[in-house]
């Protein structure tokens, strides 16, 4: 071999290898000390880009999980508040049920109504004060609220919480048909009862016979109420228009085909003769008689059969001629507040004919709190007939209009035209029992007084009080009102349950999403770790290798430098 001293190639090779080993050792120490395989872009450019993307996704998913938990907190806050409201509604319904029996006096019912009013105030207080981070939850403003629960924009869950104030819940539909004065066979059909289909009930005969009448029709409707959502009640009552005066029935006097015969009775039926005679056959006729608080004769069919009076009951009973055949009024209730659409055949025998006056109203929980408007009261079925007023006690129509409680006031536009004083035109027993009957007494026109020749539409604006329909006291202070409050409270409970069910569905959706993105976040972090984090086992081996090479490199360099000393031996 040759000996050269100007260029020590062996030393240069040893130094070069030592430099490489030093860099490897530095890199290995950097990875071991940081725990990362990628400490700079130079370590793995493409790997770093992928790892950074995965880290961003994992961090975003972490915030999405936090957002989802916030959503759950909001929904749980609303749910617990509504749970308290449901307890309040349960109490309201219980108190309404307590008031719905005639063992209660007006005083005790008024106390119950006061309790109900306080409960409604608390229900509204909960609705108006329940909030989360300053955001109202139950006031009706929490609509289509979005929560970002994904790594990319617009990956959201929407939540809506309906209003729960007493003015917004409990909306119940009440419809009461006109008084039925003719018998017949009725085919009753509910249109679009579920938004799509019609429901046809079995045919029912409206008559005075056993197993017929509005009672039978109501039973047919109620046995399908779970499917249709419509329930029915009935009122079949014939009431005298004035307190009973002394008189006598005819020998041919009969009710529902059962002969009662001649009965002499006193003022107010003081001797009980008339009531006793009618009730002696009540098991056969289905009609029960009583004297009400105003001294008027009241005939009631509790089975829902018609009440038909044959012969002469006597003028002292003050039963209008048009009420001698009475099949009552049918009331329908629907708990979703929507209109009850009816079709069928011979609907006039059910009180829902095209020409009959049908009272209808949708009533919220709050509306049952105060005085019940006359129109709403009629829709709820307060009136057994379109009750009228007796004009026989007034010298003229104009005198009646001027009287207290007539429903008219000065300047109302209703007056008797010149020369049309009808004081002699009214017999003592003539009453206005319905708009249709009013036209048979005298036609009415608005603005020009009671004039002959007027059409039905001309008296359409007459106040309901003129027909004897009046406002009713608040809520449960009457039996009918208590029944109506029970219906409304039941609707309100259903409304809140529906809102809570919607909230529960969103809660389940959010919970499932959180569970899913939690797993996704773990997997994304695992993928990032595979790329970014160092494998300590492998890197320890690399470190040991680099460390040994560094030591051996130093020894090799020392040996390479000492080789030059061999040249001196040649010069000795």
From Swiss-Prot:
Function: Flagellin is the subunit protein which polymerizes to form the filaments of bacterial flagella. FlaA binds to flagellar assembly factor FliW protein, preventing FliW from binding to CsrA, so that CsrA can then bind flaA mRNA and represses its translation.
Tagged with keyword Membrane: no
Assembly information from the UniProt record: Heteromer of FlaA and FlaB. Interacts with FliW.
Cellular-component GO terms for this entry: bacterial-type flagellum; extracellular region
Any one Gene Ontology molecular-function term assigned to this protein's record: structural molecule activity
Protein name stated in the entry: Flagellin A
Additional comment: The mRNA is localized to the poles of short, probably elongating, cells; mRNA localization is lost in an fliW deletion strain but restored in a csrA-fliW double deletion. Correct localization requires protein translation; mutation of the start codon to prevent translation initiation or a premature stop codon (at position 3) prevents mRNA localization, a stop codon at position 101 leads to partial localization to the cell poles.
Name of the encoding gene: flaA
Keyword Transcription carried by entry: no
Family annotation (Pfam families): Flagellin_C, Flagellin_IN, Flagellin_N
Inactivation phenotype: Has 2 short flagella probably composed of flagellin B (flaB).
Cited NCBIfam families: PRK08411.1, PRK13589.1
Gene3D superfamilies: 3.30.70.2120, f41 fragment of flagellin, N-terminal domain, Flagellar export chaperone, C-terminal domain
PANTHER family, A to Z: FLAGELLIN
InterPro entries: Flagellin, Flagellin_C, Flagellin_C_sub2, Flagellin_hook_IN_motif, Flagellin_N
Compartment list: Secreted; Bacterial flagellum
Protein family per UniProt: Belongs to the bacterial flagellin family.
Keywords, ordered alphabetically: Bacterial flagellum, Secreted
């Amino acid at each position: 071999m040759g000996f050269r001293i100007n260029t020590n190639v062996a030393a240069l090779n040893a130094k070069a290898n030592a430099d490489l080993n030093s860099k490897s050792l530095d890199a290995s120490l950097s990875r071991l000390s940081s725990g990362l395989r990628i400490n700079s872009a130079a370590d793995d450019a493409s790997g770093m880009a992928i790892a950074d993307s995965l880290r961003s996704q994992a961090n975003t998913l972490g915030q999405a999980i936090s957002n989802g938990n916030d959503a759950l907190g909001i929904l749980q806050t609303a749910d617990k508040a509504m749970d308290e409201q449901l307890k309040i509604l349960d109490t309201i319904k219980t108190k309404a049920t307590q008031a719905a029996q005639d063992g209660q006096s007006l005083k005790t019912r008024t106390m119950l109504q006061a309790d109900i009013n306080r409960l409604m105030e608390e229900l509204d207080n909960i609705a108006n004060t329940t909030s989360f981070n300053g955001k109202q939850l139950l006031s009706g403003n929490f609509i289509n609220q979005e929560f970002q629960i994904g790594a990319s924009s617009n990956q959201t869950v929407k939540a809506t919480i309906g209003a729960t104030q007493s003015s917004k819940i409990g909306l119940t539909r009440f419809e009461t048909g006109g008084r039925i004065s003719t018998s017949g066979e009725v085919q009753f059909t509910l249109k679009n009862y579920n938004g799509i289909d019609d429901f046809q009930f079995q045919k029912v005969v409206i008559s005075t016979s056993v197993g017929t009448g509005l009672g039978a029709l109501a039973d047919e409707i109620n046995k399908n109420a779970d499917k249709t959502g419509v329930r029915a009640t009935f009122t079949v009552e014939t009431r005298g228009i004035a307190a009973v005066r002394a008189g006598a029935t005819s020998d041919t006097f009969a009710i529902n085909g059962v002969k009662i015969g001649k009965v002499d009775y006193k003022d107010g039926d003081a001797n009980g003769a008339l009531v006793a005679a009618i009730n002696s056959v009540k098991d056969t006729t289905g009609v029960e008689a009583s004297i009400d608080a105003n001294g008027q004769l009241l005939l009631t069919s509790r089975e829902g059969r018609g009440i038909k009076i044959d012969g002469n009951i006597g003028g002292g009973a003050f039963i209008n001629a048009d009420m001698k055949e009475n099949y009552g009024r049918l009331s329908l209730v629907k708990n979703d507040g929507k209109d009850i659409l009816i079709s069928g055949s011979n609907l006039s025998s059910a009180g829902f004919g095209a020409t009959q006056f049908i009272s209808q109203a949708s009533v919220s929980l709050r509306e049952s709190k105060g005085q019940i408007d006359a129109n709403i009261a009629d829709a709820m079925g307060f009136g057994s007939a379109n009750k009228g007023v007796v004009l026989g006690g007034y010298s003229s129509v104009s005198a009646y209009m001027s009287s207290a409680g007539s429903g008219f006031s000065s300047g109302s536009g209703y007056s008797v035209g010149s020369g049309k004083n009808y004081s002699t035109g009214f017999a003592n027993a003539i009453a206005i029992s319905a708009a249709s009957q009013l036209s048979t007494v005298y036609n009415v026109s608005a603005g020009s007084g009671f004039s002959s020749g007027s059409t039905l539409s001309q008296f359409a604006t007459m106040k309901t009080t003129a027909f004897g329909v009046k406002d009713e006291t608040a809520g449960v202070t009457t039996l009918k009102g208590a029944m109506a409050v029970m219906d409304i409270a039941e609707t309100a409970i259903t409304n809140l349950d529906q809102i809570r069910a919607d909230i529960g569905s969103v809660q389940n959706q959010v919970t499932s999403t959180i569970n899913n993105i939690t797993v996704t976040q773990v997997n994304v972090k695992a993928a990032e770790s595979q790329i970014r984090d160092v494998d300590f086992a492998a890197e320890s081996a690399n470190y040991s290798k680099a460390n040994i090479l560094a030591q051996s490199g130093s020894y090799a360099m020392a040996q390479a430098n000492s080789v030059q000393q061999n040249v001196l031996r040649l010069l000795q």
